Amino acid sequence: MNPPPERPRGMSYPYEFKCLISQLKSTKTQEFINEYTKDSAKLPSENVTEYKYTDAEDMLTELCELYSYGEESTYKSNSEAFEAVIKKLGLPRSWKLLSDAEKMSILMSLANDLDHRNVRVRMRASEGILYIAQGCWADLVDTEEHAESIGFNGILLYHFGIFTSFVDLLKIEVANFHNKKELSENNSRNLRIILNVLYTITEVIRKEKNNICSEYTHHVESFCTEMLFNDESLITILFDMLVRFCDCHTYSYHFPLKKVLLLLWKLLLIALGGLSELEETKKEIRMDNGLPPEHDSSEEQQPDPNRFLDVINLIDLIGESSQRGRVKKRPKVRQEEHNKFLRNARLRFEDSNVKDDDTDVVGLPAPICSSIEIIKKHLYTPLGQRHVEREKLVRSHPDTHPDEIELTPAELIYEMLFPNFNEYMVSLLKVVLWCGKFRTERLFSGRPPISGLAPEADPNSRILYSVVLYIDLFRHNEIILKAVSAILLLLLKHLKLNNVYQFEYMSQCLVTNNVLTILMAFFKQNIAGFVTTLNEIPALNFTECVTGTSEIKADCLNQVCTSTVSSRNMFFCINFLRVLNKLVKWKPARIEHLESFRNSKAILNRLVEIKHDTIKLYALKLLKMQMKYTRKNWRKRHVHLINEIYNRVRLHMNDSFLTYVPPKMTRDKLEDHKDENLLRKDIAEFNERRYGDLEKQQHIDIDFCTRKVVETQWLLPYCLNRAHHELLTQEFLC
């Protein structure tokens, strides 16, 4: 038997995990896997277009992704913990048959056990609460009934204060988790139970927030308030857990990373809002700043026989005939492009230029004046420009223009994350590096082991369990990438809407840590076959295990390839493309860095071949930015790409993306990064002026003088002074 794959120094895999990993490399297992995946590399292009990009999947699908296939044995343990409480109180076993008073008595008993000193008692009560959060599935057989039960129980648990209690439990377990030098699977099991309860309640709140006719709107508002206005928010706790895991993974390899990232993503999604809420908020903010709403959509272009009289319109019509029903976006013109056009026209026809005058057209020919009118008609002022203008006024005239900070959700989250923002971004990029490898020989290289993944293997069916592990490993990576991509995109979009300097600071943190290279290396893989490979075993999903049979048989693998496209993989591929577009848009230095990546245009060309409109759109946008650095021969060979760019990507009125810029005419290195350096300086001044106090709190000098510490008068709360002797007796003298 082959030795286990290479691992980071200082790590040790569990024995069962070693055996299954070694079994993965055996000849019989590889033949089984190759037969299982032989049809996965085919690209059914007509079915890829069926995927609809949304903020997240439905509640049950998201809950299924929370659990690994190796956690199926814990479902029964949760049910037994609940039955023990029922037996203790002398109540009927069925949750549906209990009255409201009896349900409250059960929750009261479990909540009391959560405060017990014994860890085993606390965790046993947590298992019982997790069974309730899972919908009390023992009496259910229907999926719809199961979803309703999860929704009702989740709201009931939040109303009873279980969510806050589990946040406190999480703090205790995290503190104990990192104080121990030797960890085992049991230490991670406690964290997994707590995170499962928190995530299930969060997912129920997300479902109620998306439901316009929900009866629990006040619970959603209370949840958002608790996330944003708490002194120690759960969002910050989860980010700190992520940083500790990435920095000290040699000691905490049992850390449930997937559950942490999934919970963090859903908390940000609830607090900040999804894409539809973002567009509505953007329209309101633009109107408050005196700007018209963004004209992204227009009427669908339909063929018109009268347009054959115009040759240019005829060319457009031919392009539309092959892409019927596509929404055409109006072109935009920036203010600096308008000023540049007017300045060049004056220098050409009047041999003069007037500074700070962008309206005078006296002396210019009539065609130029008509062109300027058309440009003004399509003039678009981005919201970030207003942010920059307001920041300049605050800096130059602080007395007459005070900085009025609106406490929006994005502002509050930025204040939470600012002291350690760079560490958080580095940790997310490390996770992308670990999980962005989709070859079997690279699956374990340079990354910590995964806890709660290996099922209990039967020696008689070792190959079958190895195949399940193989599928679950890739599934685990895909879910982690899905969460990380959504977190990055959510933060980028909402911070850009709140204040452009916050967005630029996050972009700077990511670009400085080589996010462009990391994402391009990720897309260098076979993405076309990857988005159609479904690493899923429906028979082992959470909903199927609790309502049916969870026994692993060879027949259950036949259900894997029923779907032809992986919505999970499509989701984070689109997200990563959108993140790349956000980071390099209107940044020449970053575009050149992206273009300098080996075979970057070939990588994007392969993405364009995927027949999905959203992936194709963002890949074409990246190609359009790099087009001015491509030579004539490349453009001749890829005329179809230029045609696709004209048909799909929004163009500017005086767009010159086809103008070739030879290397000898490019700016030197200092001039090329001049804008980046100025932007970095503005960001530093913005953060120092607004959040300087938050950063200073992280660098307070500590006085280690014992005498001064003893002489210091500490003011204790009244309740602590009153119960001081009782506390000493219970905690220290017993």
For each feature predicted by the language model, list its residue ranges.
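Extended alpha-helical scaffold domains
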Residues: N2-C734
